[in-house]
């Protein structure tokens, strides 16, 4: 049965970014923790300690790693500091004054941070015994911190400045709330999240794995996991075919020059794997190959292979293309953050007069995908550029045109949306779908982008009705986003209980005795003939264990087969969702399974 987290509408858990007071509380808590650590561990050097969406952390350089016992002692010391009701005082100083004070404390990391700051330099004091180089904001006194509404959660390794070549630090994570009730609810949700963790369930259900000889962030898919992937791919391919998409296949790598034209090499290089070159000279001239971080330049080459007529447009090219991003090892997380992943990528080449209708059609496709997957809680983010940043390519006019097109489409659809400044891709704005899961965590899934820049950079053209050469507009879209991330989210959303149409194993036949094995195989052959994914449990275990094993494997449908069923050519059907369905003939079961799977019903 698909499980949902219990309703907790009475207790709200706002994000830090949604609450100015939580931002102050959590930021100050990181300082309180650093003060406690340096009192208990005088050799610990401080680095940075920001707030996060659910709490805070602080990175320390220490001779020895922190233990669980250390965390308990640190928390106890933090309670003492809070109960002293210390004033939190902001002080402005000159660079020279800040440098002198930091050098006197012997804090090299703070000295490095200071070098990147402009005056005035601000310090925050906890009473008169501890201070930190910080821009704030903070509470006015530790009396605003509730000693019963925080906890220290874990210790992890981290690199200074996120650079693997620099010092390894100890990061202590904590959480802090305004009330003890919020802390209790947060812990409940976290415990539920651990039960649903896709890394845990993926291992238990035998869907995917990671292997050290292969490397971090590179998942290996088992036969069951591959069925899950293929089912999702086939579903989307069928939906795309109905809408006039054409499938293409492109290589996993290309010459650096391709990505120089697209702008990826200049604007996205830090996220790409290093260049592969034949020798040092070629490397110096940047004449090598790189693994692709995106599929769009390849699809552009297919479009550009021949001169297009206005009558051919829109051209919709689609590919499940594997791309590669050089994520830092500390940023990797199961399937939701990997180094090699498959994007359900498509690029539409349209005339300007087709842009609005094609954009709306893409959104309709994404919404239909969400409906089939029973993903109901999501919101739309219009991801626009930050006009103060220089990381984007293209003119202001082009950006304004693209952003206006996306906003107009969202308003035409009557969508509730919010604008995310600075969330755009470097080449164009996006409409991103942010999904909220059963535990109120947010994930970006589908995305649609309007792009006037890459057609310009690659000099794309089509012959207009009057014979002139015109520039097409590109739409980038991916309903799933990343197939790996989607599967990770679905595992957690369904708690491993996949709907019938998506389950890697849809029905398991449970023979009570060996004498009915031949009949079981006959039934299995009939079900496979209509495309049902079926297995026969030939372990010889007793019926109770057969059922428990099927339940543990979260098989949607079980068919118990004994001598009576074999003689009458029937099956005794049980489902995880509705329990005992009684006796069915093979023909009845076949009909019901076919109908439920075709209609993508959650269960039989």
Swiss-Prot record:
<dbReference type="InterPro" id="IPR045864">
    <property type="entry name" value="aa-tRNA-synth_II/BPL/LPL"/>
</dbReference>
<dbReference type="Pfam" id="PF00587">
    <property type="entry name" value="tRNA-synt_2b"/>
</dbReference>
<feature type="binding site">
    <location>
        <position position="347"/>
    </location>
    <ligand>
        <name>Zn(2+)</name>
    </ligand>
</feature>
<keyword id="KW-0067">ATP-binding</keyword>
<dbReference type="InterPro" id="IPR036621">
    <property type="entry name" value="Anticodon-bd_dom_sf"/>
</dbReference>
<keyword id="KW-0963">Cytoplasm</keyword>
<dbReference type="GO" id="GO:0000049">
    <property type="term" value="F:tRNA binding"/>
</dbReference>
<feature type="binding site">
    <location>
        <position position="296"/>
    </location>
    <ligand>
        <name>Zn(2+)</name>
    </ligand>
</feature>
<dbReference type="InterPro" id="IPR018163">
    <property type="entry name" value="Thr/Ala-tRNA-synth_IIc_edit"/>
</dbReference>
<dbReference type="Pfam" id="PF03129">
    <property type="entry name" value="HGTP_anticodon"/>
</dbReference>
<comment type="subunit">
    <text>Homodimer.</text>
</comment>
<feature type="binding site">
    <location>
        <position position="476"/>
    </location>
    <ligand>
        <name>Zn(2+)</name>
    </ligand>
</feature>
<keyword id="KW-0694">RNA-binding</keyword>
<comment type="similarity">
    <text>Belongs to the class-II aminoacyl-tRNA synthetase family.</text>
</comment>
<dbReference type="InterPro" id="IPR004154">
    <property type="entry name" value="Anticodon-bd"/>
</dbReference>
<dbReference type="InterPro" id="IPR047246">
    <property type="entry name" value="ThrRS_anticodon"/>
</dbReference>
<comment type="function">
    <text>Catalyzes the attachment of threonine to tRNA(Thr) in a two-step reaction: L-threonine is first activated by ATP to form Thr-AMP and then transferred to the acceptor end of tRNA(Thr). Also edits incorrectly charged L-seryl-tRNA(Thr).</text>
</comment>
<keyword id="KW-0436">Ligase</keyword>
<feature type="region of interest" description="Catalytic">
    <location>
        <begin position="197"/>
        <end position="499"/>
    </location>
</feature>
<keyword id="KW-0547">Nucleotide-binding</keyword>
<keyword id="KW-0862">Zinc</keyword>
<dbReference type="Pfam" id="PF07973">
    <property type="entry name" value="tRNA_SAD"/>
</dbReference>
<protein>
    <recommendedName>
        <fullName>Threonine--tRNA ligase</fullName>
        <ecNumber>6.1.1.3</ecNumber>
    </recommendedName>
</protein>
<keyword id="KW-0820">tRNA-binding</keyword>
<dbReference type="InterPro" id="IPR002314">
    <property type="entry name" value="aa-tRNA-synt_IIb"/>
</dbReference>
<dbReference type="GO" id="GO:0046872">
    <property type="term" value="F:metal ion binding"/>
</dbReference>
<keyword id="KW-0648">Protein biosynthesis</keyword>
<keyword id="KW-0479">Metal-binding</keyword>
<dbReference type="GO" id="GO:0005524">
    <property type="term" value="F:ATP binding"/>
</dbReference>
<dbReference type="InterPro" id="IPR006195">
    <property type="entry name" value="aa-tRNA-synth_II"/>
</dbReference>
<dbReference type="InterPro" id="IPR002320">
    <property type="entry name" value="Thr-tRNA-ligase_IIa"/>
</dbReference>
<dbReference type="InterPro" id="IPR012947">
    <property type="entry name" value="tRNA_SAD"/>
</dbReference>
<dbReference type="GO" id="GO:0005737">
    <property type="term" value="C:cytoplasm"/>
</dbReference>
<dbReference type="GO" id="GO:0006435">
    <property type="term" value="P:threonyl-tRNA aminoacylation"/>
</dbReference>
<dbReference type="InterPro" id="IPR033728">
    <property type="entry name" value="ThrRS_core"/>
</dbReference>
<dbReference type="GO" id="GO:0004829">
    <property type="term" value="F:threonine-tRNA ligase activity"/>
</dbReference>
<keyword id="KW-0030">Aminoacyl-tRNA synthetase</keyword>
């Amino acid at each position: 049965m698909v499980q949902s987290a219990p309703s907790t509408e009475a207790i709200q858990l706002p994000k830090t970014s949604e609450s100015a007071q939580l931002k102050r509380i959590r930021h100050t808590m990181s300082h309180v923790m650093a003060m406690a650590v340096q009192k208990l561990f005088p050799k610990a050097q401080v680095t940075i300690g920001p707030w996060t969406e659910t709490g805070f952390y602080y990175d320390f350089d220490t001779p020895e790693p922190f233990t669980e016992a250390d965390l308990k002692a640190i928390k106890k010391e933090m309670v003492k500091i809070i109960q002293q009701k210390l004033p939190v005082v902001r002080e402005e100083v000159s660079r020279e004054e800040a440098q002198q004070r930091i050098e006197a404390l012997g804090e090299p990391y703070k000295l490095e941070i200071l070098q990147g700051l402009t005056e005035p330099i601000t310090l925050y004091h906890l009473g008169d015994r501890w201070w930190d180089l910080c821009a704030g904001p903070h509470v006015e006194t530790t009396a605003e911190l509730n000693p019963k509404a925080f906890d220290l959660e874990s210790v992890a390794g981290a690199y200074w400045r996120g650079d693997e070549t620099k010092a390894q630090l100890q990061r202590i994570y904590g959480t802090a709330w305004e009330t003890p009730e919020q802390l209790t609810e947060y812990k409940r949700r976290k415990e539920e999240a651990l039960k649903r963790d896709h890394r845990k369930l993926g291992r238990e259900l035998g869907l995917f794995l990671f292997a050290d000889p292969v490397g971090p962030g590179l998942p290996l898919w088992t036969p069951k996991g591959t069925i899950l992937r293929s089912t999702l791919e086939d579903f989307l391919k069928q939906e795309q075919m109905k809408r006039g998409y054409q499938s293409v296949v492109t290589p996993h790598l290309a010459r650096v020059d391709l990505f120089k034209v697209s702008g990826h090499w200049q604007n996205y290089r830090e996220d790409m794997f290093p260049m592969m070159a034949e020798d040092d000279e070629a490397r110096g001239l940047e004449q090598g190959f790189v693994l692709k971080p995106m599929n769009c330049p390849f699809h552009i080459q297919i479009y550009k292979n021949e001169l297009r007529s206005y009558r051919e447009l829109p051209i919709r090219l689609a590919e499940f293309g594997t791309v590669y991003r050089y994520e830092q090892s500390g940023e990797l997380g199961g399937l939701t953050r990997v180094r090699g992943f498959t994007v359900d990528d498509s690029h539409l080449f349209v005339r300007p007069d087709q842009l609005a209708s094609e954009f709306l059609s893409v959104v309709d496709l994404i919404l239909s995908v969400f409906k089939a997957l029973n993903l109901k809680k999501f919101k739309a983010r219009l991801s626009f550029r930050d006009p103060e940043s220089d990381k984007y390519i293209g003119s202001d006019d082009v950006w304004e045109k693209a952003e206006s097109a996306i906003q107009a489409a969202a308003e035409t659809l009557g969508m509730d949306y919010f604008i995310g400044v600075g969330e755009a891709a470097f080449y164009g704005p996006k409409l991103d779908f942010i999904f909220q899961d059963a535990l109120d965590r947010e994930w970006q899934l589908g995305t649609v982008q309007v792009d006037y820049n890459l057609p310009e950079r690659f000099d794309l053209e089509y012959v207009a009705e009057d014979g002139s050469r015109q520039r097409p507009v590109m739409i980038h879209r991916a309903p799933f986003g990343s197939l790996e991330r989607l599967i990770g989210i679905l595992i957690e959303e369904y708690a491993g209980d996949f709907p019938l149409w998506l389950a890697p194993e849809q029905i398991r036949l449970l023979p009570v005795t060996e004498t009915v094995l031949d009949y079981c195989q006959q039934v299995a052959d009939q079900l496979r003939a209509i495309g049902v994914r079926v297995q026969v449990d030939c372990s010889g275990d007793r019926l109770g264990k057969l059922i428990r094993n099927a339940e543990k494997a979260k098989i949607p449908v079980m068919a118990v087969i004994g001598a009576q069923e074999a003689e009458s050519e029937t099956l005794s059907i049980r489902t995880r969702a509705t329990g005992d369905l009684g006796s069915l003939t093979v023909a009845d079961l076949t009909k019901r399974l076919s109908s439920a799977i075709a209609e993508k019903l959650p269960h039989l």
